[in-house]
């Protein structure tokens, strides 16, 4: 049986097309994916992301626990409210999930994890927490709303009290503060500025309606996917999973290798993989007509000029750029060109760094893009 967020009736009343997303009935769009996408790039849009899982961790040794559990190092989080992005790995170095962790207070951290991996995540965390005396509290009482776009923060700020506005003023990216009943974080999944706001479920409908009245457009999963793809952000189950190393998913920057004595889960496997030259994740741009899709095979050449193959992990038409873009897993060291066959035609691709649009601006040169380095 599919689950519903507390905002389900609101979505239906606003004309959303609802679909089953990993067991949750979620809005795909409210009439126009393209208009919703452009609203986030040019103004402000909002997403119900209450299907995601919020987990609070408590304990005297909770920091030690997370330094063991996560590939990134929460020792970097010294200021309450600061957050970081990390992979949670298995012993083989595969990605169980990618998540955001917040340092809330002494002996208290908060995780926000994916809905599709909820049960596996909770089981994995629960398996390793007892050795550190950590208490796990899933926050089913909270809803989560993402407000994204160049005017998102100012539109939300206008709804806050003067005291609340002062508390969130000047917050840098990847930071969160509890302001009254709202936990407001400067995070997102679109490549735009904005907030992700956790709040009690019994306040969510009224707050959503306030956001609508403030001129913020409701957006669905379809726009969320094209926005994150333009931003070069991974989607669990496509760019990475339990069989794929973060080194092959453009997540090497999230691995904290220092200090060398920190023995996080999966470290030994990653150290072995480093010497084996794992695959890499690249961006693709196709300027000819056609749409790149996940699962397509691409042809390319390796560092020695020999033919090799890669696989598209995510692909779509880019509403911002007006052409097709994709993320693809390929051998290390390929050149700046690749090819794909669509409907019997071999079409040329430019190989670029993952990430195509940020803050509404193209990261791709108008002519042939610069090739990805090793």
From Swiss-Prot:
<dbReference type="GO" id="GO:0005960">
    <property type="term" value="C:glycine cleavage complex"/>
</dbReference>
<comment type="function">
    <text>The glycine cleavage system catalyzes the degradation of glycine.</text>
</comment>
<dbReference type="InterPro" id="IPR028896">
    <property type="entry name" value="GcvT/YgfZ/DmdA"/>
</dbReference>
<dbReference type="InterPro" id="IPR006223">
    <property type="entry name" value="GCS_T"/>
</dbReference>
<comment type="similarity">
    <text>Belongs to the GcvT family.</text>
</comment>
<dbReference type="Pfam" id="PF08669">
    <property type="entry name" value="GCV_T_C"/>
</dbReference>
<keyword id="KW-0032">Aminotransferase</keyword>
<dbReference type="InterPro" id="IPR013977">
    <property type="entry name" value="GCST_C"/>
</dbReference>
<dbReference type="GO" id="GO:0005829">
    <property type="term" value="C:cytosol"/>
</dbReference>
<dbReference type="InterPro" id="IPR029043">
    <property type="entry name" value="GcvT/YgfZ_C"/>
</dbReference>
<comment type="subunit">
    <text>The glycine cleavage system is composed of four proteins: P, T, L and H.</text>
</comment>
<dbReference type="InterPro" id="IPR027266">
    <property type="entry name" value="TrmE/GcvT_dom1"/>
</dbReference>
<dbReference type="GO" id="GO:0019464">
    <property type="term" value="P:glycine decarboxylation via glycine cleavage system"/>
</dbReference>
<protein>
    <recommendedName>
        <fullName>Aminomethyltransferase</fullName>
        <ecNumber>2.1.2.10</ecNumber>
    </recommendedName>
</protein>
<dbReference type="InterPro" id="IPR006222">
    <property type="entry name" value="GCV_T_N"/>
</dbReference>
<keyword id="KW-0808">Transferase</keyword>
<dbReference type="InterPro" id="IPR022903">
    <property type="entry name" value="GCS_T_bac"/>
</dbReference>
<dbReference type="GO" id="GO:0008483">
    <property type="term" value="F:transaminase activity"/>
</dbReference>
<dbReference type="GO" id="GO:0004047">
    <property type="term" value="F:aminomethyltransferase activity"/>
</dbReference>
<dbReference type="Pfam" id="PF01571">
    <property type="entry name" value="GCV_T"/>
</dbReference>
């Amino acid at each position: 049986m599919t689950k519903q967020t507390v905002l389900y009736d609101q979505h239906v009343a606003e004309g959303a097309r609802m679909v089953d997303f990993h067991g949750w009935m979620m809005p795909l769009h409210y009439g126009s994916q393209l208009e919703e996408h452009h609203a986030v790039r040019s103004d402000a849009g909002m997403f119900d992301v209450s299907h995601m899982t919020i987990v609070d961790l408590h304990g005297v040794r909770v920091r030690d626990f997370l330094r063991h559990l996560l590939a990134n190092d929460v020792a970097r989080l010294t200021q309450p409210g600061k957050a970081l992005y990390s992979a949670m790995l298995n012993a083989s170095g595969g990605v169980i999930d990618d998540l955001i962790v917040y340092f809330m207070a002494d002996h208290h951290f908060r995780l926000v994890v994916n809905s599709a991996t909820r049960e596996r995540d909770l089981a994995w965390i629960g398996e390793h927490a007892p050795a550190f005396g950590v208490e796990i509290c899933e926050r089913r009482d909270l809803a989560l709303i993402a407000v994204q776009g160049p005017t998102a923060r100012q539109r939300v700020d206008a709804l806050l009290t003067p005291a609340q506005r002062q508390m969130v003023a000047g917050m840098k990216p990847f930071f969160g503060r509890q302001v009254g009943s709202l936990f407001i974080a400067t995070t997102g999944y679109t490549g735009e500025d904005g907030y992700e706001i956790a709040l009690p479920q019994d306040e969510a409908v009224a707050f959503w309606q306030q956001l609508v009245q403030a001129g913020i457009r409701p957006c669905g999963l379809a726009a969320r996917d094209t926005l994150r793809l333009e931003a070069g952000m991974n989607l669990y189950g496509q760019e990475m999973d339990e069989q794929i190393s973060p080194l092959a998913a453009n997540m090497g920057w999230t691995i904290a290798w220092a200090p060398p004595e920190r023995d996080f889960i999966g470290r030994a496997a990653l150290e072995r993989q480093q010497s084996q030259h794992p695959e890499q994740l690249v961006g693709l741009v196709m300027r000819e007509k056609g749409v790149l899709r996940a699962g397509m095979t691409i042809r390319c050449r390796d560092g020695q000029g020999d033919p090799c193959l890669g696989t598209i992990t995510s692909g779509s038409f880019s509403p911002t750029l007006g052409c097709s873009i994709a993320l693809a897993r390929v051998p290390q060291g390929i050149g700046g060109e690749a090819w794909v066959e669509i409907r019997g035609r071999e079409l040329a691709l430019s190989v670029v760094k993952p990430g195509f649009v940020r803050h509404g601006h193209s990261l791709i040169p108008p002519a042939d893009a610069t090739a990805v380095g090793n």
